[in-house]
Design a protein with these regions (language model features):
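Charged, glycine-rich intrinsically disordered N-terminal tails and low-complexity linkers that flank
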Residues: 1-92, 252-333
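Non-catalytic protein-protein interaction segments used by genome-maintenance enzymes to assemble
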Residues: 111-180, 377-439
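Well-ordered, non-membrane alpha-helical segments in soluble/globular domains
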Residues: 171-176, 219, 349-355, 430
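Phosphate/pyrophosphate-recognition segments in soluble nucleotide-handling domains
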Residues: 216-302, 335-339, 359-380
């Protein structure tokens, strides 16, 4: 119930108008429910900390929207959407999207539509005391807003990267209500909501109907969804922390000053993971374009070896998280491949063999009950010295006699071993060593350790790293600093053309790559 919703310490409500943007109804792992609720209710931190802005534009759809503003607006007028300088990859992506948008929505003289000068907003004023102490509720939409000359027809075109799963019913219902009842402009007779994918130009109709049908859709799906947004209580540390105005008062985000071994107080707040670090080391532009979520090439992203590795991880995660923890055995189902993965017969057979090898080193032999196991948990720490939110997702955290153990699992098709130092080969283990050595995972330090499990056709290797051994900690700290230092001071993310371009999943958007067409 809304009565039990409470803000954290350190915030002040500055408005009695509740404003909800339609995107909040989508939810998902990249949104924080508690932050959305605070934002809708008009809360601000009591002592806001000035933040430095990024030099480059980081809103992936912003330049596309700005280009559409120029295309549809009066000559010489600046676009409504303001953007910063563009990275080469974002410019290429945006130009690609505009070209496909014009092809998907050609001008129709028989049914002319014009862009409205101001997006619609639905306003509602409670007739009596409001449980959330609001004088007014507002729902807003974002996208390309078009209407017929007489205003009887409204259409909202929602730009997305690709057409994925359908958005939640509550999202579509809220948008339909704004189109049907929002101002400015006369009430329409019909409304339409359509998604447009910048990647391939495909469109998908989410709703089309009369004004009354739109209102009925909201009555069916909207109120519960709205309450879910307004009364969100879950703090969800993760990638959203990078731009969160409530980070300094968040009760769920743990701080880890000095974790990365660098210090700078004049840099934009950012997020970082070992995956980002690897991508940046290969090519700064590659990491930046991945962070922008530019579409990747399936021929690279879902290459069969990588796909087999992800399928094995998904199988083990489900097995380890299911019910009472029981050690895995050599009995592997013939149809072991989880839903969503497509492997050829020889890869399925190899995967089954590797899973049987896992039984000999399954960590569930050491746990007491389900509370001792965390499969792919989200480990998030704010390094306040660097102002970087560090993100990690170990394959498994398990408790051995009260001590937390960080387990990473890898696969190999050969029995050859590398001579390269372990913490350099697998930087996620370096992060694990530093976190455990600092006591950030809690628990009894006596048996706390990091483990690397490598599944091979001939058997399983299990490497154990003592995080409290001085040499291991020094090496781990050095590995992290080396991965982070240059990236932390970089504002341009210049491409670094070379052999890695051949296996770059975002090469299509990079004009510096000589293999961009092949990667597409």
């Amino acid at each position: 119930m809304s009565q039990s919703w409470l803000p954290p310490d350190g915030v002040t409500r500055t408005s009695d108008v509740i404003t909800v943007s339609a995107g909040m109804f989508k939810g998902g792992e990249f949104r924080c429910p508690a932050a959305d609720a605070l934002k809708t209710r008009g809360y601000h931190t009591t002592d806001p900390i000035p933040r430095r802005r990024e030099r480059l534009e980081h809103f992936t759809l912003g330049p596309f929207m700005a280009a559409c503003d120029i295309r549809s607006g009066p000559a010489g007028h600046p676009p409504r959407t303001r953007t910063g300088p563009l990275h080469d990859g974002l410019r290429t992506w945006s130009e690609h999207g505009v070209t496909l948008y014009e092809a998907a929505f050609p001008l129709d003289p028989e049914r002319p539509l014009h862009e409205v000068p101001e997006p619609w907003t639905y306003r509602y004023r409670p007739s009596g005391p409001d449980p959330r102490d609001a004088q007014e509720y507002r729902l807003t939409v974002w996208g390309r807003c078009l209407a017929s000359p007489d205003g009887a027809y409204r259409e909202l075109r929602l730009p997305v990267h690709r057409l994925r799963d359908l958005p939640p019913d509550g999202f579509t219902a809220a948008v339909a209500l704004v189109l049907a009842e929002g101002a400015p402009g006369p009430p329409p007779e019909h409304v339409r909501i359509v998604e447009f994918a910048l990647f391939d130009g495909r469109t998908r109709e989410l709703f089309a109907g009369s004004r009354e049908e739109a209102r009925a859709r909201y009555r069916e799906h909207g109120p519960a969804a709205l309450a879910g947004v307004l009364d969100g209580r879950e703090y969800r540390p993760g990638s959203a922390c990078g731009g969160c105005p409530y980070l300094s008062v968040c009760p769920a985000l743990r701080t880890a000053p000095g974790l990365l071994g660098i210090e700078a107080h004049d840099r934009p707040r950012r997020t970082w993971s070992v995956t980002n670090g690897r991508a940046y080391r290969a090519c700064p532009a590659r990491d930046h374009m991945r962070r922008l979520h530019l579409p990747t090439a399936d021929s690279v992203e879902r290459e069969v070896t990588a796909e087999r590795g992800r399928a094995l991880h998904a199988y083990l995660a489900e097995r380890h998280a299911h019910g009472s923890p029981r050690p895995c055995t050599v009995e592997v189902p013939e149809e072991w491949v989880p839903e969503g993965f497509d492997l050829p017969a020889h890869e399925r057979a190899l995967g089954a063999l590797l899973l049987r090898r896992h039984a000999a080193v399954c960590p569930l032999r050491y746990v007491g009950d389900g509370t001792d196991v965390r499969t792919e948990p989200r480990v998030v720490r704010h390094d306040t010295a660097a102002d970087v939110v560090v993100l990690a997702a170990p394959d498994l955290l398990y408790r051995d006699a009260g001590s937390w153990v960080w387990r990473e699992t890898k696969t190999s098709v050969t029995d050859r071993r590398s001579d390269r130092p372990l913490l350099e080969r697998y930087p996620q283990l370096a992060l694990a060593v530093v976190l455990i050595a600092r006591g950030d995972l809690g628990g009894d330090p006596f048996r706390a350790r990091a483990e690397l499990e490598v599944l091979r056709p001939g058997g399983a290797d299990l490497e154990i790293i003592d995080p409290f051994a001085p040499a291991n900690r020094v090496t781990a700290e050095k590995v992290l600093r080396a991965m982070v230092a240059e990236w932390h001071g970089d504002d341009q993310y210049a491409a670094r053309p070379g052999r890695s371009c051949e296996r770059c999943e975002v090469a299509r958007w990079c004009t510096a790559s000589s293999v961009s067409e092949a990667a597409a």
